[in-house]
From Swiss-Prot:
This is Probable RNA-directed DNA polymerase from transposon BS. CDD domains: RT_nLTR_like. Pfam families: Exo_endo_phos (PF03372), RVT_1 (PF00078). It catalyses: DNA(n) + a 2'-deoxyribonucleoside 5'-triphosphate = DNA(n+1) + diphosphate. Residues 482-758 form the Reverse transcriptase domain. Its EC number is 2.7.7.49.
């Protein structure tokens, strides 16, 4: 049994000491760090490899870097953050850790020495920690109970609070602070108070390793700690695939009949259980490996560390300036050696990085971790106002929020509701059964599955599906065809595990600030792929989806849809017209889809057998929210298409297929209107010689759209719906305001649609400025890889730029390629700087030489290459709207560059 180690230390400013703390924590195998007096501004963070960071800042008017505490917890420990106290008097951060003694709360506390803290304040803080806790830090309180030579007023107040609460003291009994000023006396103000921990299990010692006027204290508690169990994969590199296939074939019997829903569910359980049993037998157990730290102290470093400890003790006891000088020299020499150790380790790691198989794709693993959004677990606020105290409460709080979200609005009238329900009661027309699923289809679909996908609750991932033997695939075909024949979807595949991802910039305590990510069964999504192919064929044959819908359709992309908008705007510029636009935001569109309304449209548009299958697929779907290893109580999804599924986007497109199109009722000339939809992103443009006439046409359409949304229980968010006007007029047009649900829409000078910023004059200057800013931010993240002194190979550096930086500005190059050279030249400057950082070349080396040696294209060459390929794709496009985007060499009034000139046409 490894004891749980806790560090208590006043850092006296941690910014320049973080690397020393990291090395100390890993070499001493410390599990929890209670660090006080960080002296960080609000928002500043400290990264210690292998530890999660939970701070509490001291409030100040000017956001000064004073006070503050933080708890660092090893990421492998199962823990949950608790309340935070941030006042001028006290800063406290708490984390609850699962141990062999039960849930134990660890808190870091810092009490400001210049303020008065009474006994009741200490009592309230200690009592709020629960029955089992350890609170350690810098109390700035002196008393003989914890080994000080005198009693201060705050010490007497704290001693009284400890007597009232029954908390015990854990201290060294000797001074923990040795001030730098010789006239000040040493004091014992760093210690811990605890409750619910047996006295014989906790010990405390002091160390002389870290540099501060406070000594670090190490507490050891003889108890086990509970570690986070990562979701185990059934088939790993330690699995004997041949043994797995043989074992699974022996467990599956094809002599079965599936003629009812109960039999289908039993077959699904049998298949899932057999896969688990076969994987358990054929996979070798692998011991859990904790977080490894690559830097190892050399013999020289250990000797210098011992020497520094000895000189520090002597300098503190003697208070001799010469002894202090020797101590500072030894500390400086040790810092230089440790800096060299870290530098050598870093250089070796960079030199070994590559994107090849032999290097284990170490380069891509490293860059992927940089792009991934950092996870910081924060307790959210429940509906009652209190904060969640553990993972189960957090999961159920999220589930309560999502259960409300997965409920359709109440907009339609009683007559409209009844009309939809009556349509569901009408008899179905005779139709041929759904085409059976062949084994060859399943095999081809499995081959195309991506490996890096998380499994659902059944833990059957895509790698497991790729290892299935022939007998298992035959059994799977029996289940799939039984679902089509019986028109029953098994309940096991209707359960979703939902992870909540924080939206950057949103308040962390609010459930609305998190985005749900659903994890569904891979067996279910494989069936959905096969059914989606059949549905797509029917939709193409019957032309169910409108041409203006480009979302989730084969051969359609965001670039073509934005191209339609820009071409319409440029035509309005040529015709000396205003182009008024409305960019519509649908509120929670996918999560609020009305099931009865969707099923009624499926019944009307598709053959009869699909009605029963999709009705069973949508009914009684459930979900559970997962927070680390804890799940919420199962909840019901009463509305919405399954998020994370294959059929979800397709069903949403079917649900919105009858979206109203602009016509003569709305506008004087509907030919000058353009409707563009990409899933739930809707844009409507209308050009006219009079900006107010264009506004009236848009207003009439929005009135019709609002009535359609009310009929099908969808909601438009007027706060996020905008009404820009595109024009080349030097004076800003005074357009008539447009209302939606009684709210006047904002009229900004630019709009962002599908990742492309469209400004008023369509110069793409704001878009290129924002894109360049994002590229510089990404290069700053990758600076440790792409700097001039990096030991990584030139080939690997080039690969990092090409695959991690260049795609940011290459997106939409077919559209913004018509911009003036002065606008996109900033991208070229960015690339030039990146090339010089990669190669570390002298200033006199020309940019053309760098482009040639690194085999990189200039921005102008990239524009020509991508637009040429784009033009070829448009010529072969099966959508008539996409083919119309091809330049027709029109007579242009303006001398500005258009799409035809970008493609090299006159």
């Amino acid at each position: 049994m490894n004891p749980l180690k806790i560090l208590i230390w006043n850092a006296n400013g941690i910014s320049r000491k973080a690397k020393d703390v990291e090395l100390f924590a890993h070499n001493k195998k410390v599990d929890i760090l209670l660090v006080t007096e960080l002296r960080l501004k609000r928002g500043e963070t400290v990264k210690i490899y292998g530890y999660a960071y939970y701070p509490a800042y001291r409030p100040s008017l000017n956001n000064n870097s004073v006070g503050g505490v933080a708890v660092f917890v090893r990421t492998t420990l199962r823990h949950f953050p608790q309340r935070v106290i941030e006042t001028r008097h006290i800063q406290l951060s708490s984390v609850k850790v699962a141990t062999g003694l039960g849930d134990l709360q660890f808190s870091a506390i810092y009490c400001s020495p210049s303020t008065r803290i009474e006994e009741r304040h200490f009592t309230d803080i200690i009592r709020a920690c629960g029955q089992r806790y350890l609170v350690g830090g810098d109390w700035n309180a002196r008393h003989w109970l914890w080994g000080d030579t005198c009693n201060s007023p705050r010490g007497r107040e704290l001693a009284e609070a400890l007597s009232v609460t029954g908390a015990k003291i854990l201290a060294t009994g000797s001074p923990t602070r040795y001030p730098y000023v010789p006239s000040h006396t040493p004091s014992c103000i760093d210690f811990a108070v605890y409750h619910g921990i047996p006295d014989h299990l906790a010990t405390i010692t002091q160390s002389w390793d870290l540099d501060s006027d406070h000594l670090p204290l190490i507490i050891s508690i003889e108890t086990d700690s509970t570690h986070v169990n990562p979701s185990p994969r059934l088939v790993t590199k330690h699995t004997d695939l041949l043994a797995f296939s043989r074992q699974l074939e022996s467990l599956i019997s094809l002599n079965t009949t599936l003629n009812s829903g109960e039999e289908i569910e039993m077959a699904v359980d049998n298949l899932t259980e057999s896969i688990h049993r076969a994987a358990a037998v054929s996979t070798s157990p692998v011991p859990r490996i904790g977080t490894t730290y690559g830097i190892v102290l050399t013999r020289e470093a250990r000797e210098l560390l011992t020497q520094k400890r000895r000189l520090r003790r002597r300098a503190i006891r003697s208070q001799d300036p010469w002894d202090r000088l020797l101590w500072n020299r030894a500390a400086k020499q040790l810092r230089n050696v440790l800096r060299e150790l870290r530098s050598n380790f870093f250089e070796q790691k960079l030199a070994s990085m590559d994107y090849t198989v032999d290097a284990g794709y170490s380069l891509w693993k490293c860059t992927k971790s940089l792009k991934r959004q950092p996870f910081r677990q924060v307790p959210i606020r429940c509906p009652g106002g209190e904060l969640a105290k553990n993972e189960e409460e957090q999961a159920n709080c999220f589930a309560n929020h999502l259960e409300t979200r997965f409920t359709h609005f109440q907009f339609a009238t009683t007559e409209q509701y009844q009309e939809t329900l009556d349509s569901l009661e009408t008899p179905l027309q005779m139709s041929l059964p759904i085409k059976p699923i062949r084994v060859e289809e399943i095999v081809e679909a499995i081959k195309s599955l991506p490996l890096k996908k998380s499994p659902g609750i059944d833990n059957v991932c895509n790698a497991t599906l790729k290892a299935l033997p022939v007998r298992a695939i035959l059994y799977l075909a029996l289940i799939y065809n039984a679902i089509l024949r019986v028109q029953f979807f098994p309940k096991q595949w209707k359960m979703a595990a939902i992870l909540m991802i924080h939206k950057p910039g949103k308040p962390e305590e609010s459930p609305e600030s998190y985005r749900p990510i659903s994890l569904l069964s891979s067996l279910s999504k494989l069936w959905e792929r096969l059914i989606a192919n059949r549905l797509n064929d029917i939709m193409t044959e019957r032309r169910i989806l409108p041409d203006h819908q480009f979302g989730f359709r084969q051969g359609h992309s965001t670039v073509e849809q934005v191209h339609r908008l820009t071409k319409h705007i440029l035509q309005a510029f040529d015709d000396k017209e205003y182009c008024n636009a409305v960019f519509i935001d649908m509120q929670q569109a996918f999560d609020r889809v009305w099931h009865d309304g969707l099923i009624s449209k499926v019944k009307k548009l598709f053959p009869a057998p699909y009605y029963g299958v999709l009705k069973s697929y949508l009914e009684d779907r459930r979900f559970m929210v997962r927070v680390r290893n804890s799940y919420s109580i199962p909840r019901v999804m009463r509305a919405g298409v399954p998020q994370g599924s294959v059929l979800g986007p397709l069903l949403y497109s079917v649900f919105t297929a009858d979206l109203p199109c602009p016509n003569a009722y709305h506008m004087a000339d509907p030919r000058k209107a353009l409707l563009a939809t990409y899933a739930d992103d809707i844009a409507l443009l209308y050009s006219s010689n009079c900006c107010n006439e264009a506004a009236r046409g848009l207003q009439e359409y929005l009135t019709t759209l609002a009535a359609w949304c009310k009929r099908w229980i969808l909601k438009v968010n007027p706060q996020k719906t905008i009404n820009p006007c595109f024009t080349l007029k030097t004076l800003s047009p005074v357009t008539a305001p447009i209302e939606l649900e009684g709210v006047i829409l904002d009229q900004p000078s630019q709009a962002k649609y599908l990742g492309i910023t469209l400004d008023k004059r369509l110069t793409f200057g704001p878009h290129l400025k924002a894109t360049t800013r994002r590229c510089y931010q990404r290069m700053q993240q990758l600076r440790w890889l792409l700097n001039r002194k990096s030991t990584m190979t030139l080939r690997a550096k080039r690969a990092v730029y090409v695959h991690c930086v260049a795609p940011i500005w290459l997106y939409g190059i077919q559209i913004w390629g018509i911009a003036a050279k002065s606008n996109y030249n900033r991208i070229q400057v960015l690339q030039n700087r990146a090339m010089r950082a990669i190669t570390d070349c002298p200033y006199y080396v020309r940019g053309t030489t760098l482009h040639r040696d690194l085999n990189l294209h200039t921005v102008e060459e990239q524009i020509s290459r991508h637009t040429s390929r784009y033009s070829d794709r448009l010529r072969r496009h099966h959508s008539i709207l996409a083919r119309r985007l091809l330049p027709a060499r029109p007579l242009r009034r303006l001398k500005r560059k258009g799409f035809a000139k970008t493609l090299g046409q006159p």
